[in-house]
Amino acid sequence: MLNNYNSLAQPMWQNGPAPGEFYNFTGGQTPVQQLPRELTTMGPYGTKHSTASSTTGTSVLGIRYDSGVMLAADTLVSYGSMARYQNIERVFKVNKNILLGGSGDFADIQSIKRNIDQKMIEDQCCDDNIEMKPKSLASWMTRVLYNRRSRMNPLYIDVVVGGVDNEGTPYLANVDLRGRSYEDYVVATGFARHLAVPLVREKKPKDRDFTAVEASELIRTCMEVLYYRDTRNISQYTVGVCSVNGCGVEGPFQVNENWTFAETIKGY
């Protein structure tokens, strides 16, 4: 019965650890782990995630009216506090149903815009005549931005998504760098949250939506106020309009400047 018994003690651990090392539970086979591209760029002292923005765009304002949406943003991209790039559009046409406006780090805006363009190409490759809707894009962006935030390497952007669905229903939403989102008849980023949103809410009729003419007038007034009050704004801006008739970006337009009221401002 004991003829085949090996009296020699077997090692307790196969592939056991060397002194000062850890046990290799994979038996010497180390799986290849593909890290996300933004986590693999090593510097001389390790990986450094960006913690601040260098080239930034300021406010984006979006207003929903009875048959569509309007988005507006100035054309300035600042380098720190310097008005470096003064002819850069920050309102984009995504497809015939969607407009996108971005503020924050402009490099991150370009990055997410390239990803969105790639998704539009994938939709076209399916050749099923089904295009992404604004609500779908906003939902997808919440997942992307929350995923980047959870990896402690966020995209420093604050975006406005607007458009119309197949039934012609307008949609307007805001998504921030943490993936938080909300819908409303007026959304804004940057200083426009404090300066423009109260102006729009004050003019909102109680029993109906804005008309296209009313929304256009509010856009003009709000961009004028932002130019006066926000040091990162300039007088030139573009307006994106999306309705059942299609989407497009119009402009650039100029603010009607009038600085005569400055004579009465005292104390600073």
From Swiss-Prot:
Gene3D superfamilies per record: Glutamine Phosphoribosylpyrophosphate, subunit 1, domain 1
Its principal location? cytoplasm
Q: Which UniProt keywords apply?
A: Cytoplasm, Nucleus, Proteasome
Task: Extract the InterPro entries matched here.
Answer: Ntn_hydrolases_N, Proteasome_beta4, Proteasome_bsu_CS, Proteasome_sua/b, Proteasome_suB-type
Extract the Pfam families matched here. Answer: Proteasome (PF00227)
Subcellular location as annotated: Cytoplasm; Nucleus
| Organism domain of life | Eukaryota
A GO BP entry: centrosome cycle
Q: Which SUPFAM superfamilies match?
A: N-terminal nucleophile aminohydrolases (Ntn hydrolases)
Q: Which GO terms describe its cellular component?
A: cytosol; nucleoplasm; nucleus; proteasome complex; proteasome core complex; proteasome core complex, beta-subunit complex
Question: To which protein family does this belong?
Answer: Belongs to the peptidase T1B family.
Provide the assembly information: The 26S proteasome consists of a 20S proteasome core and two 19S regulatory subunits. The 20S proteasome core is composed of 28 subunits that are arranged in four stacked rings, resulting in a barrel-shaped structure. The two end rings are each formed by seven alpha subunits, and the two central rings are each formed by seven beta subunits. The catalytic chamber with the active sites is on the inside of the barrel.
Q: What does this protein do?
A: Non-catalytic component of the proteasome, a multicatalytic proteinase complex which is characterized by its ability to cleave peptides with Arg, Phe, Tyr, Leu, and Glu adjacent to the leaving group at neutral or slightly basic pH. The proteasome has an ATP-dependent proteolytic activity.
Query: What is the official name of this protein in its record?
Result: Proteasome subunit beta type-4
